[in-house]
Amino acid sequence: MSKQTGAHTHEEKGKNVPVILFFTGLALFFIGLFLGNMLLVKNILFSLAAILAGYHIIGEGFGDTYRDTKNNRKFSPNIHLLMTLAAVGSALMGSFEESALLILIFAAAHFLEDYAQGKSQREITKLLNLNPTEARLITDDGSIQTVSVEQLKIGDRVQVLNGAQIPTDGVVIEGSTAVDESSINGESIPKEKNSGDPVFGSTMNGSGTIVVEVTKDSSETVFAKIVQLVNQSQENQSEIASKIKRFEPKYVTLVLAVFPLIVLGGALLFQLTWAESFYRGLVFLIAASPCALAASAVPATLSGISNLAKQGVLFKGGSFLSNLAEVKALAFDKTGTLTKGKPEVTDYLFVDGLEDRQDELVAVLTNMEKKSNHPLATAIVNRFEAETTALNLEVENIVGVGLVTTIADTTFRIGKPSSFEQVPTIIEKQTTKLASEGKTVVYFAENQQVIGLVALMDVPNEEAMNAIHYFKSQNIETTMITGDAKLTGEAVGRLVGVDQVFANVLPEEKSAIVDQLKHEVGMTGMVGDGINDAPALVNADIGVAMGDGTDIAIDVADVVVMKNDLSKLGYAHRVSKRLNKIVQQNIIFSMLVVATLIILNFLGIANIAFSVLIHEGSTLVVIFNGLRLLVNTK
């Protein structure tokens, strides 16, 4: 019934007035029912009841039709016009009571539908209202000044009290706390934050007062981007919703064209009286009205988008959410998408006979790596630091050799395997095995003799493996794209469980692989997080950016997962499938109701009151069916 594009101006401008007038009209209608034989007074009261209760419906029927016709330069009637004409026609026949009843039922359903459709909109508004407005700025003299968030500049320092909202994106420079980041990524478990850790605007400071240095303008924060994406998503309708919107004026025009044929046919072919034939035409206007059909897609789509936004998955439009269920292939960038994005120690080994010295040697290894800023060194330190004692070492980083230190005339060296000439057989065999598993190996030597190794790998994250398993269960072909060597790429691919791996891929080649998948498999999605993923994200039917990724990847993608958790993309796929199923249910149900009412009208069974009651009831059923998507999908 409702015009989905927001023609309900009565909601925005004095939204209580239509409700007050509706109940005034309802009261007049009931007064008229009890006036007995005072026919003139009754008809006046019924007419006033219809005008007061349905003035906004009449206005939208004639006013919007005139405006849309003028803008489109062709006749563009709407559903409200059908109801208005049916009410006017009924009054012209002298059935003022039935005319008023039609408008009252239609208006009552109108308010219920607006409320129901507004529920998904209100859920989105709740999210947008989380946007912080004020901040406690620390001035140059150390005093605290409350300012609007828009006044903050990069480099400013702000104080965030216990239990307060963090006003903007920044980095902690004083204090420690636990932050609830559910407004950003949908995760309810607070994250520990210490000096140097990033924080995001709109999140809630939990357990301690902190000082944050502003790192982004208020318009560029993560939450500001979320607001932008959510607003954009409401404007971009699903394909089926767009088709229904375009179809509505054509359908209503057809109904209006059929109306005189029914009136003439009833009188000339079926020997009905002109009054009865005209009445059947009026019932047809109501029965054929596509109210429920018009509400089949938009409320459901907004509900799905709202649900996913609360889970930290942002769609830039309803069309992308609807299309996700149709994807036949998904291509994944490896680093940071399927893997954690940072190397971790997976294995370490010392040659036989050094069991008693293992703790000592691990301590030397760890303290040597502390002197390096290489990612592999960081991974080794993270793995062993808690288990070792600190040593004061002089470490030299020699190009082509590695890290070298001397302790009491004993020289220790850490380097890549190719920098060592002689290697024990056990180390050599393990190196071959570990390399076949896609792991990077570094050697540890004492006095030029290799005595151990450490293997590292950018390991797959568990959420990614579970997500790949889910997508494969949905018959979606999964592909991993990586710039790594073939051996490493295929090893990671086996661990994650993807169907195929493209290794040694240059950034500019990723888009060509997406083209290949589109040609061979069908609708293809691309999931990535880096600048080099941007061309492929744009080229894919659906581009998905992981939230820890670069701004350019997020800007060009159609979907943003605010946390690097692919299980959330799997959840979005389930919501998409459920959305399409609900929309199909709504369309079939609404068409069956229209067909049933038209048949009952031709059989002479349906009257105006019955038709409008069933018709508006079916519209409410369709809307509430769509609102089920506000509830989490299993």
Regions found by a protein language model. Name each.
Residues S2-N16, F29-L35, E60-Y66, K70, ...:
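Membrane-embedded alpha-helical bundles of multi-pass transporters
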Residues D409, G452-Q585:
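Conserved ATP-binding TGD loop and adjacent catalytic N/P-domain core of P-type ATPases
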Residues N43-R67, L101-D114, K119-K126, S238-F332, ...:
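Hydrophobic alpha-helical transmembrane segments
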Residues F350-Q474, Q500:
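P-type ATPase nucleotide-binding
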Residues S2-K3, L33, F46-P132, R157, ...:
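Actuator/coupling domain of P-type ATPases
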Residues K126-V212, K216-D217, S319-L365, T406:
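Conserved cytosolic catalytic loops of P-type ATPases
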Residues I210-K216, V442, T479, I552, ...:
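A short beta-strand structural signal in non-transmembrane regions
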